Structures are given as C-alpha cells and as structure tokens.
Design a protein with these regions (language model features):
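Extracytoplasmic gate region of multi-pass secondary transporters
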Residues: 1-42, 128
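Multi-pass alpha-helical transporter architecture, strongest
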Residues: 150-177
Length: 177
C-alpha cells in the first residue's frame, strides 16, 4: 500500500500538510532518476548475491523509509530525500525478479511466470492506491494507510528473506531450442 499510495496521493498529502503540491512533481522526478540508478545497482548486485534476499531487503528498506518519512513533519528536503530513497529501491525489483524467476523455474517458463509476478505487483499497486484513498475518505487521514503499508512491507520483506535462506539458488536451465 505504501509505494503506490505515495504516487497517487502524494500531491494531496503535501497540500493538506500546507506544502506546495508542485513539490510532488519534483519528488516524482527525483524518484524517476533514482529508479534508473536503483535498477542498475540491483541488476549488478543480483549477479553477485542472493536475489531473493536482496528482494526482501528492498521490501524492508522501503518500509523503513516510509515509516521514517511519515514519522517526521514533511519538509521539501525530507520529501526529496524520501523520493530519492524510494526511487532507488522502487524498480530495483525488476532485475531481481527476472533473475530469481530464471533461477527458480528455468528459462522455459520465464516469460509467463515473470508476467504473473508483475501482474500481481500491479494488482497490489491498484489495491494500495485505491485502498489509501478509501482510508483517507473514511478517516480523513492517511495514517492508517501508511501503517498498513509499512506493516505489509516489513512482513513481505521478512518472509522473502526467510525464503531466501531456506531455498538454495541454482543457475537457470536453458530452454530447449
């Protein structure tokens, strides 16, 4: 719930905090720039370390960044720093998921399984954005949405790291020609 609520609701969150909603556009730009760096870094890191553990680490650090940002009163500086952190961690899942799918299931089914993995991410994004809006409409505050986002992210990260520790990785098997 956390990351998607951030994109769809940040402009409104900043406005109700008395900040210029244009800061939301600037933050989205920072997120986009750091997405590139994070994707490159995690692609590199996934070649060297356990991809599943790295994925779990991303989920945990996203949640910690979300908790940090919403525990503080927002300022332009903290908002842009938060955007940089989230951007670095956001799309870093792409190369890790692709590599993990290849290692876990082989290359023969990679396109289908990777498609299902990203479809589930998109369904989660929809539920997060829509759910965050519903929570705000019902309660007049995003606090519960942030707490749910942090809790789900921490749980996902811990489960992912635990799974990484019990499941050994293997090189992907070649698909038949």
């Amino acid at each position: 719930m956390g990351a998607r609520v951030l994109i769809s609701e940040m402009w409104y969150y900043l406005a109700i905090c008395g900040m210029d909603p244009m800061l939301s556009a600037q933050t989205l730009g920072v997120i986009g720039g750091f997405n590139v760096l994070g994707s490159l870094f995690f692609g590199w890191a996934g070649q060297r370390w356990n991809k599943l553990a790295l994925l779990g680490g991303i989920y945990v650090f996203r949640s910690l960044a979300l908790a940090w940002y919403f525990m503080l009163p927002p300022t332009p500086g903290t908002t842009l720093l938060f955007g940089a952190i989230m951007g670095f961690l956001w799309l870093g899942v792409g190369p890790l998921v692709a590599g993990a799918v290849a290692e876990l299931f082989g290359l023969q089914w990679q396109a289908m399984i990777q498609g299902l993995a990203f479809m589930s991410h998109q369904l989660g994004s929809f539920m997060g954005a829509y759910g965050g809006g519903l929570i705000y409409d019902a309660l007049g505050s995003y606090n519960l949405a942030w707490r749910i986002g942090v809790s789900l992210g921490l749980a996902a990260g811990i489960i992912q790291v635990a799974f990484a520790l019990i499941r050994p990785t293997r090189p992907p098997l070649a698909a038949p020609a």
